[in-house]
Amino acid sequence: MPPRQLSQTTPSCAVVPRKRRLVAALIAVPGLMPALAHAQLVGEAAQPQPIDAPWGMQLAPQLEERPLQPGQKPATFVLGDTTSGTTDQDMAAKGSAEVRRNTVVIKADALHYDQDTDMADAYGSVHVVNNGNSFVGPEAHMRVDSSEGFMTAPKYHFNVTGGSGSAERVDLLDNERSVFTKGTYTACACADDPAWYIKGSEFDFDTGADEGVAHNGVLFFQGFPVFASPWLSFPLSGERRSGVLPPTFSLSSSNGFELSVPYYFNIAPNRDLTLTPRLISKRGVQLQSTFRYLSPTYSGSITGEFLPDDHLTKTNRYALYIQHNQNFGNGFGGYIYYNKVSDNTYPEDLSSSVNQFMNGTQLLYQQEAGLTYNNGPWSVLAREQHWQTLTPSVAPYGREPQLNVKYAKYNVGGFDYGAEADYSNFRITTADMTQGQRVMFNPYLSYSVVGPGYFVTPKVQWHFASYNLNHLSDADVAAGTPKNFTESIPTLTFDTGLVFDRSVRIFGQDYIQTLEPRLYYVYTPYRNQQSAPLFDTADSDFGLAEIFTPNTFVGNDRIADANRLTAALTTRFIDAATGDERARFVIAQQYYFQDQRVTLQSTQTSAQATHSDLIAGASLKLGAGFASETAFQYNADNNQLVKTSVGFGFSPATGKVINVAYRYTRANTTLDNTPINQVLISGQWPLAHRVYGVGRFNYDLGGHRIVDGLVGLQYDADCWTLGAGIQRYANGLNTSGQNQSSTRFLAQLTFKGLSSVDNGLMTAFRSSVAGYTPLPPPPPPESRFTNYE
């Protein structure tokens, strides 16, 4: 309503022209800014610092906000170039007019304030600041204390959350809630011409709950509508909120065009649910659902996927993934991992988008539940383990059930000792395979002598195993093998080394160079173990990590006989100023005093050699982000390079990385006579302003084919990002037994300030490129004191 005409008869209320004048403090001033601070300093930092002893003035370390005392009311201030009014009734101001109370500021060309109704009417270039939210328009009417009122044709900005927009009208319900009619919303900094915005018939905003709701909302990007919904909920900042997430698109040779539209339910701070309809042009509509939960004592997730009547296979297809971890307290815990798919080709055809760009196809699905106990030296595991195996993978043995107990004590008078006891009932889904029970007990005792520049560690351990087989297969055990038998095998190791160091200066830089010779001796007598099936045992790899272990097998069904000595020499170059290791060189070889007779299969011949292949490795870290790692295995008797890997990495700055690697393994029987001869190149590099390229290229030189390849682009704008990638990947074998490949495409558009969800593209970039740096997140929202008025 228009301002009331004020009487000019009272001298104290006469119109007095001036440039700026504080007219009245209508109510006593108990405190200026009550109860607003989100964070407070504590301790000595929060104490005022004296700066003027005679006057007792102090420098406050932060804004202090004093709550009102009981019975006190906040002060109201009216300012203007010219003012008129009646004390304790109303006041009118013109020219740079203002009304202030607590966190509410109303500015206008002219305004009228009625104390009885607490109503402020503002006209002309109105600017309302309410609890950090800013509204600009031609006219506003609101109750100052309750922050209730309306404004016509407003432009608004939420200072703390960063959102802004415009509308035909806004109704302010209080200092946090507001309703906009026929408005827009964006989180872009350039509100006049935003890259994306939501347009709706009505918006409900609650800055306290950090939530916005658009009715009949349409999402525009670069001026074009990309999504519409009769009800669209979204967060006003980076906090989680229920609502529709941005749709994702992909294209593959096996599925055609795909469109996924996730809907996110923020059930509670520690629980959420995501429902995702997934349209697959060649197969139909799949529904995906993921429920996550978290508490101080348990956490987990349940994911289900269902595709009714696949257009290509004419079957219903599904997948179920359950993961649960439980902490019962006092060292007790439990877990459940259950994963199942409907058919053998499900992971190839319908792998979820999050896993789409991961290399390879999952063929083993774990189904396991267990109880654990960990307390001091004790570690106990009781579990039931099963596997779903997809062709052409070979099924592993399950443990149905297993009880494993470990005990370990360290440095008890210089001694380390412990034991592992295990009972397992091994079962397998493959027909006509040996099954049965195994009881194992492995105690050990070692004593370490460590001094300046040397160490000596002798160790003795024993392997006891008892087998009770309930089914024998002619395919994996020799004829006449008993069903019940035991094994007892001792092992003695002796590990010793020296460490020398000296100061050196290389290219003007001071380093500490070390020289570290090491000897490792192993003795294990021969025991015939061909009666034992291979439940969990395979050949160990041969490298720098395995050369100092007593057994050449992994698992407990084979203990290799040994009488060998491993000799190694390591030298390091350490930056004398920082302690950073800049270079390392290692060379090692094993020397055999007798031939190893224990083999995995009875048909294999035992190794006959006086020494092993030579193993060497080197790692370098140079300036300007350059690093290199090299390792090779060389057979001096045959003058053959058995295995090598050479890798280089260059990362001069964030978002810039190039990796080059070469891998080679000579053909041998343990690798099914299949050599490895591959070149791997990957990297991330800025191509132009805000544009980054991401790529991975793995090429098989022997087979003249691409093992896997990925090419992607990322564009990082102020309030949106766009990523796209295309991948060529190995996808199993065809009916002729030859390798087959597939191609797929995935795009991801992210609106900063509206949503942040990865549909699998960022995961692919991160896993494909070592040293990959994600695009920077949007800047944090401004403080409510920014642009303070």
Swiss-Prot record:
One of its GO terms (cellular component) is cell outer membrane. Residues 1-39 form the signal peptide. Keywords: Cell outer membrane, Membrane, Signal. Pfam families: LptD. It comes from the Bacteria. One of its GO terms (biological process) is lipopolysaccharide transport. InterPro entries: LipoPS_assembly_LptD (IPR020889), LptD (IPR050218), LptD_C (IPR007543). Belongs to the LptD family. Together with LptE, is involved in the assembly of lipopolysaccharide (LPS) at the surface of the outer membrane. This is LPS-assembly protein LptD. It comes from Paraburkholderia xenovorans (strain LB400).
